Each structure stands twice: as C-alpha cells, then as structure tokens.
Design a protein with these regions (language model features):
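Long, low-complexity, charge-biased intrinsically disordered regions
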Residues: 1-196
C-alpha cells in the first residue's frame, strides 16, 4: 500500500482493491473526503495504466503546452537535449530577454523533475546562466525545446518487476575550467522506472 499526499490530494496505490477500500473507509471516517475514483492526471502528469499491471507517467500534453506558449511548436526536432561540444560561458554582452529565458527554464525544471530526467543535465547547466545569458545560451535552450518536440510522448514506465531498488551515479569533478563547476548525477530505479 502506498499513499501519496500533495496538499489536499491523496493518491492510494495498492495490489488489493479490498485493502484500498478499507483505507478509504478509515480516512473518510476521520476526515471530510471526496472520492474522485481512479486518477487520470495529477499535477500535470498523466497516469496511463497498462494491461500487464504497469503504469506510464507522461507529460506529453504539458510539453505541447510549453512548446506552444514559447513559440516552438513548429521547430524541427533535435536528436539530443544538449550538444556536449558547445562550451557555455558567461555572457560578456547585453543580456537578452532574461525573463523569458527564466520562464522557459522553470517549465523545463518541472518536466525534468517529474517525468523527463533525460533533460536534467541540460536544464541544470543552462540554469547556471539565468542572470548572465547570451545568444549561445538561447541556442542551447532552444535545442532542449526542439528535443522535447521530437520526443513528446516519452515518459517513465513502471512495471511490477524488478522489485529491487537500483542506483547509478557518476561525477565529473572539474568539467568546466572557467567556472570550476563540478557535475554529478544519479538515478534510482524501482520497477524499471526512475524514482529519483
């Protein structure tokens, strides 16, 4: 049994419908509660149930909304979210459209933390330049949006197995000689999908 709480919303997950009903009964006896049935979307994340007991978390509708909002619906897709040959440095010229850049970064951070961990590195790298950006930062940011355009349907798929927590990590302690920034990353998987 898993209970997920967010402010005044509760998701109840379990393998037995009887146990879920019992938990709902206990909660409704102690709190004012409204049962909305099976959840389809929560916090802009679609829950897609598979016939084999798996579930996929997707934000394709949110990606579409972000691309439309920032005028990237008609752009050509990019194969990867980040080009490692591009060296991002502090801007030495006039800052270009800082507010819009930070709005896009915020939208991408939400995607990266919810269902699109594959863009985390690029978004993290680009967020370092929110207060000091130039044209090369914009081109790199546009690449992330173009990558999402080509992969809107991507999400995180969870299966019943394996029931083992797997963890992976890596680090590059001095990857940027100009700024002396260290870069590290990690991923923990459960049921075949990323949980952290």
């Amino acid at each position: 049994m898993i209970l997920c709480l967010y402010v005044d919303d509760i998701l109840i997950f379990g393998t037995s419908l009887n146990v879920i009903k019992e938990v709902k009964g206990l909660l409704s006896n102690n709190f004012e509660m409204k049962d909305l049935g099976e959840a389809d979307v929560i916090l802009n994340v679609k829950l897609i149930r598979e016939g084999n007991g798996g579930v996929t978390l997707s934000q394709s509708h949110y990606v579409e909304k972000v691309l439309s909002c920032f005028g990237f619906s008609d752009h050509q897709p990019a194969p990867t979210p980040y080009d490692p040959s591009v060296l991002l440095r502090k801007n030495q010229r006039i800052v270009r459209d800082q507010l819009r850049y930070s709005q896009i970064i915020s939208s991408l951070m939400y995607l990266a933390s919810a269902t699109r961990p594959g863009i985390s590195f690029a978004v993290s790298k680009l967020s370092r330049f929110v207060s000091n950006l130039g044209d090369h930062h914009w081109r790199a940011l546009e690449r992330v949006l173009r990558y999402l355009k080509g992969n809107m349907s991507y999400g995180i798929h969870y299966t019943r197995y394996p029931r083992v927590l797997e963890g992976y990590c890596d680090a590059n302690w001095i990857s940027d000689a100009d700024e002396l920034y260290a870069t590290s990353g990690y991923a923990f998987l459960l049921g075949g999908g990323v949980v952290s």
